[in-house]
Design a protein with these regions (language model features):
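Helicase motor core with emphasis on the C-terminal RecA-like subdomain
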Residues: 1-14, 18-44, 49-456
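Short, well-ordered loop/turn sites that connect or cap secondary structure elements
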Residues: 30, 476-478, 503, 510
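Extended, highly charged accessory segments
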Residues: 410-413, 417-481, 495-496, 538-540, ...
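Short, acidic/hydrophobic/Gly-rich beta-strand patch recurrent on exposed beta strands
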Residues: 483-486, 529
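A conserved acidic, glycine/proline-rich C-terminal tail/linker
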Residues: 489-508
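Nucleic acid-processing catalytic cores of prokaryotic defense/repair systems
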Residues: 512-513, 641
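Short beta-strand-centered aromatic/proline hotspots
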Residues: 514-521
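Short, solvent-exposed secondary-structure boundary/capping segments
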Residues: 522-539
Length: 810
């Protein structure tokens, strides 16, 4: 076991602490010259474990120059870590400088850091990539000994992970002895992450350090005072019960799966906050100052509750939080664990959490998540080949720092795990794209960013391309947004341009915890004033969070195993029993499809459990095929668990609608004709550097960016359909926007194992998804009564009884 320097040993002793086993194991790995992946629960001291070898080295051999680079998924987390690191450094009187470098860092400080860096620099992948675009980067990183990647699960399987992996390959060239360290609490397959971290797949070079298990979390499902609702996915019915829990605890975080739901829940809680407890709201669309105020109030213990989204999933260390509430189903066991970890943030004390299911299917999902956490099961991560638009951006960044040869660049790129098997021909296509923009665009000087000289070295064609790159580099491409403002200029945050376009003067909507009335749109601003009138909720774009495959499998098994049912509330058991009597229950290895007439329409419900994204895609494809078959489809709705189509003519042969060739025919046509591919192209065009978001002193509006990318998209589709970025956009549209992998699995099941049940009326299991048809027709936030009436009528039909005279929400 590693010995600590006396000054560090004394610091632990003065606090009454003893270094944990995994913290010393990280020091052992460092002394053996090995990289390391640390997997340990929240509150186990992962951050200190990651930095401990660096502190020891700097105590034993003080040096100037950059020693340790820390990479975080969030700017706020980097700032938080700086504060936490400075405590032991100052208490031990160590001459170690720790600084952050993010988009919020001043240009003067950034310039100084390039010449005289601190010993420890805390940053994000995007800021690191920009730093590598400067000629000074070679000297700056030559002294680097360690890179520490926090919350690695938030990076590795994504485009940000591709960028970070490429950056690590460059850093390893500049500092050959650099060690790589990654930290996480929620890794399902450490072998995959060790391979990603190693770069070359040699996982034996990466030690796996596992922390001791902490106290088992205290998780419960909050049941309503009445019955579990048939429909909805928000848990809004439980506002009073949640408020009681807030009052009974010191500080609570109320997690919601969407920003719009966070606004609704905040309003619901405020309406029943009879004790006038201080409650805040935090999500990614709010103004930065509003988010920082909420974070500061939480850190100071001034709030009793904070309603939040995924913006607070990672790394927040507020020790006074003693309750986490998950509104609606958590969608994955890893996400639930991550959120539970926000409570107590101490290893030896159980984190307390409540799950508030939105409906009966979500009750099953909540129980599945609880069981998965208990069993130590994590959601699997899907690693894929590196994105080509990210590679194009990286090549441009390195060209800005120094000339390079093709052979050296290819070899270096292949040292990044996502690109380790990159074909030479594909690399040449990416290099050619950076050099000319592609065949159809090569006549335009603006796309000829790098040129090869007679000496075989590639250089940037003109200094303006370097400035252009640094202004526009980044992986996160936001949708076109408008700033929400009061007339006095105060900014509340941003909403999507599409939502703003649906509003007229005097329309109302909830935002930033306020009810707002639209006054008008001017330029990039949506002007509003406060109002007390009822309000809608902004609809935020992007894919919804789908249920994980692990939880979906557990829910399937619940349905198929009646011996599990005694664990469930009486009304959930009654629901499943009624389904078993009136139809059949879905089996894990079969695809149940029900058809039935209702009110002059013909319905088909498919219980596929592949998540909302895949179901949305399949709904579009199946209704297209129904149209071709002359079934006169009217529409469809999708949930995480099922798809329901409704048409004027009945479906008699569902197998024909679900054949696997739908991915070769209708899928290709649909994606190419829909806005999906254009949206994906917009993102890859910005990331790949084909279109700029910013010029010196001026930022393009979302509409201007969309116009530019749509124009180029049409040109390339016509004149160069094999263009690199069209290929990249197609891959994005398939994998991220349509979840084509899960779609394929669904169709494979359907190929041989469809169970078709033709019914005289709606089944009990179909009620939750059919209620969504009513939800599609009415504005969010104003539809509850209408939906309750619709749900009651459907329940009455499914159960074979007359509807109650007074609709019940349960």
């Amino acid at each position: 076991m590693s010995d600590l320097p006396p000054i560090l040993d004394g610091w632990f002793a003065a606090r009454g602490w003893t270094p944990r086993r995994h913290q010393l194991a990280m020091l052992d790995a460092a002394r053996a010259g090995k990289s390391a992946l640390l997997v340990a629960p929240t509150g186990a001291g992962k951050t200190l474990a990651g930095f401990l070898p660096s502190l020891v080295e700097l105590i034993e051999r003080p040096t100037e120059g950059l020693h340790t680079l820390y990479v975080s998924p969030l700017k706020a987390l980097a700032v938080d870590i700086q504060r936490n690191l400075m405590t032991p450094i100052e208490e031990m009187g160590l001459a170690i400088r720790v600084e952050t470098r993010t988009g919020d860092t001043s240009s003067d400080k950034k310039a100084r850091q390039r010449i005289k860096p601190p010993q420890m620099l805390l940053t994000t992948p995007e800021s690191l990539s920009l730093l590598l675009s400067y000629p000074e980067s070679a000297a700056m990183f030559s002294t680097l000994r360690t890179i520490v990647i926090d919350e690695v699960h938030a990076f590795a399987p994504s485009k940000r992970g591709d960028l970070l992996s490429l950056c690590m390959a460059r850093l390893q060239r500049l500092a050959p002895d650099m060690r790589r360290v990654a930290l996480s609490a929620t890794v399902a397959d450490p072998t995959l992450y060790r391979g990603w971290l190693s770069g070359d797949g040699e996982i034996d070079r990466v030690a796996l350090v596992e922390g001791d298990a902490g106290a088992d979390p205290d998780i419960a499902i909050l049941l309503p005072l009445g019955r579990v609702p048939w429909a909805g996915h928000s848990g809004r019915y439980a506002a009073e019960q949640v408020m009681q829990q807030i009052a009974a605890h010191t500080t609570s975080i109320i997690f919601c799966n969407t920003r719009s739901l966070a606004e609704l829940i905040f309003q619901d809680l405020w309406a029943v906050n009879e004790q006038h407890l201080p409650i805040g709201i935090h999500h990614g669309s709010l103004d930065r100052e509003a988010r920082e105020r909420a974070e500061g109030a939480m850190a100071d213990g001034k709030l009793r509750a904070l309603v939040a989204t995924a913006s607070l999933d990672l790394g927040v260390d507020w020790g006074n939080v003693d309750l986490v509430v998950q509104m609606g189903a958590p969608k994955g066991s890893s996400r639930l664990l991550q959120r539970i970890g926000r409570a107590n943030h101490r290893l030896d004390e159980p984190s307390k959490a409540l799950i508030v299911p939105g409906n009966r299917f979500e009750y099953l999902e909540a129980q599945a998540a609880l069981d998965a956490v208990e069993a130590g099961e994590r959601d699997p991560d899907v690693f894929r080949a590196g994105a080509l638009d990210v590679l194009a951006q990286h090549i441009m960044a390195l060209a800005a720092s120094a000339p390079f040869t093709r052979a050296a660049m290819l070899a270096e790129v292949r040292e990044a795990a996502p690109y380790s098997t990159l074909p030479e021909e594909t690399f040449d296509r990416v290099l050619g794209f950076v050099a000319t923009g592609g065949y159809a665009l090569r006549a335009y000087d603006r796309y000829q960013r790098i040129v090869e000289g007679p000496d075989g070295l590639w250089r940037v064609a003109h200094p303006r391309f370097i400035a252009q790159h640094r202004l526009n580099a980044g992986i996160i491409v936001e949708a076109a947004m408008l700033t929400v403002r009061f007339r006095n200029g105060r900014s509340l945050g941003r909403v999507e341009e599409g939502f703003a376009a649906s509003l007229s003067p005097k329309d109302t909507f909830f935002f930033s915890g306020l009810s707002l009335e639209v006054e008008g749109v001017k330029g990039e601003d949506l002007f509003v004033r406060a109002t007390s009138r009822p309000a809608r909720i902004p609809t935020y774009g992007g894919a919804r969070m789908p249920i994980s495959t692990n939880l979906a499998d557990r829910v399937r098994h619940f349905l198929h195993e009646p011996e599990q049912w005694p664990r469930f509330p009486p009304d959930v058991r009654e629901w499943l029993e009624a389904q078993r009597q009136r139809s059949i229950l879905p089996a894990p290895d079969r695809l149940l499809i029900e058809t039935f007439p209702r009110e002059g329409r013909h319905y088909m419900v498919c219980y596929s459990f592949e998540g909302w994204n895949a179901h949305q895609s399949l709904g579009m494809l199946v209704t297209r095929r129904m149209e071709t078959a002359g079934l006169q489809p009217i529409g469809f709705v999708a949930s995480d668990y099922a798809i329901a189509t409704y048409s004027l003519k009945p479906v008699t042969d569902p197998a024909a609608l679900f054949s696997a060739d739908i991915l070769d025919n209708e899928f290709v046509d649909w994606v190419q004709q829909s806005s999906l591919l254009k949206r994906a192209f917009r993102e890859v065009a910005v990331i790949g550097g084909l279109v700029e978001r910013q010029h010196p002193g001026k930022r393009k509006t979302g509409r201007q960016v969309s116009f530019s990318t749509d124009l180029i998209y049409d040109v390339l589709r016509r004149y160069e359909p094999e263009h690199l970025l069209l290929e990249a956009a197609w891959e994005d549209a398939k994998a991220r926007m349509t979840d084509v992998g899960r779609l394929g699995r669904l169709l494979d099941t359907a190929a041989e194992r469809i169970e078709h049940v033709d019914l005289e009326r709606v089944s009990p299991l179909a009620v939750p998804v059919l209620v969504l048809i009513g939800r599609e027709k009415v504005a969010a936030g104003t539809s509850e009564d209408a939906l309750l009436i619709e749900a009651e009528a459907l329940v009455a039909e499914a159960m074979g009884r007359p509807p109650e005279s007074t609709p019940s929400p349960y």
